[in-house]
């Protein structure tokens, strides 16, 4: 299963999943993709189950790219432990996914095959997803920061 080789810190805070994905929201490698429609934590086990389902369906044909990586540790306390005495130990790894994020890409297979493989992968995931192709995929607009409004000071006011 996927997990980082080493991290700077063993434990992380939970954080929030606000807004849409600004990175990883374009199809870069294959011809077809699976886009997240909801925010969620996706575990390393779910990613691996999805990958196996796709690989088993396409067999030797085509290529699969996993566009997400579980880099966030989730801690759990041991069973029947009293409150206090610090944070629990890291038990598994998750990937924070926001709406619009490309989860998987596929290439080198017909669209019908890719669509069915992605459908099987989607059943292993805890969120709603959408199948997209490079041809019909609308590019997300780049976020432009508004320029600060400058108010001109009248010369007589100085």
UniProtKB/Swiss-Prot annotation:
Keywords tagged on the record: Ribonucleoprotein, Ribosomal protein, RNA-binding, rRNA-binding, tRNA-binding
Residues covered by region (Disordered): 1-22
GO molecular function, one term: rRNA binding
The UniProt record lists the keyword rRNA-binding: yes
A Pfam short name: Ribosomal_L16
InterPro entries per record: Ribosomal_uL16 (IPR047873), Ribosomal_uL16_bact-type (IPR000114), Ribosomal_uL16_CS (IPR020798), Ribosomal_uL16_dom (IPR016180), Ribosomal_uL16_sf (IPR036920)
GO cellular component assignments: cytosolic large ribosomal subunit
One of the GO biological process terms: translation
Family named by the database record: Belongs to the universal ribosomal protein uL16 family.
Function per UniProt: Binds 23S rRNA and is also seen to make contacts with the A and possibly P site tRNAs.
Cited HAMAP family: Ribosomal_uL16
Subunit-level organization: Part of the 50S ribosomal subunit.
Official protein name in the record: Large ribosomal subunit protein uL16
């Amino acid at each position: 299963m996927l997990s980082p080789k080493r991290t700077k810190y063993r434990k992380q805070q939970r954080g929030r999943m606000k807004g849409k994905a600004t990175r990883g929201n374009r199809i870069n490698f294959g011809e077809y993709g699976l886009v997240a429609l909801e925010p969620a934590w996706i575990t390393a086990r779910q990613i691996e189950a999805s990958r196996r389902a796709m690989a088993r369906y396409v067999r030797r044909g085509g290529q699969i790219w996993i566009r997400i990586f579980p880099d966030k540790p989730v801690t759990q306390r041991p069973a029947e432990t009293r409150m206090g005495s610090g944070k629990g130990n890291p038990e598994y790894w998750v990937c924070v996914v926001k709406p619009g994020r490309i989860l998987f890409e596929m290439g080198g297979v017909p669209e019908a095959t890719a669509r069915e493989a992605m459908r099987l992968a989607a059943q292993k995931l805890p969120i709603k997803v959408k199948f997209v192709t490079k041809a019909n995929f609308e590019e997300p607009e780049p976020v432009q920061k508004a320029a600060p409004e400058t108010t001109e000071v009248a010369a007589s006011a100085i």
